[in-house]
Amino acid sequence: MADSTDSIRKAAVDAIKSGEDVARRMREVTLEALRNRRFDREGIRDVVRAVTEGMAAAAPASGGTVRQVMGQAFRGMDEALTKSVEAGEQALRQLVATGRGMADHEVKDALAGLKKIEQDFIETVSAVASSANERARPELRALVERATQFGTETGKQSAKLMAEFTFTGMELAGQFSARFAQIASGVLAGMADALEKSAAAKRKIP
């Protein structure tokens, strides 16, 4: 499968080893993996785990370089997950706008799930850090600590969404319905395509 764990991990390794525009490359790797999976928390965690494992495996030997590269790679993942939240927001707005057959709990569960993406992101990176090699472990832990203390762009996007949708019952399971997942996956694929075309156009400019 094109989106298998091994292929995602290898793509992340290649992005790190390229040493160029690591944040953009990692964002593209993460987005490509996300768009090829069902839009749900389990799929997102699987992608984050595989990408982070690739980051750790490819960590260069130099301490200073490790910090810089890992920071860029983490930022790329964060940017991709921010797009996931944005895709979820658009899917939610589409569902609310149509309203036909729309159950209140479907909206609440989708919101609860989107709210937890940052938590899943940080916890997954932290879990990978625990078993990472000696070069990558301290840098991953530092990234987790910083993200926990100051937050991520993914979390900021989620918070913005929560402020706009004032529903109660946010402590639901946070599982995405099939209908929501299908719409969000389509939106995310469109975002990924647009970003890819924009990046390709910029690379052509002398």
List the model feature ranges, each with a label.
Residues 4-205:
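Extended, low-complexity, charged alpha-helical tracts
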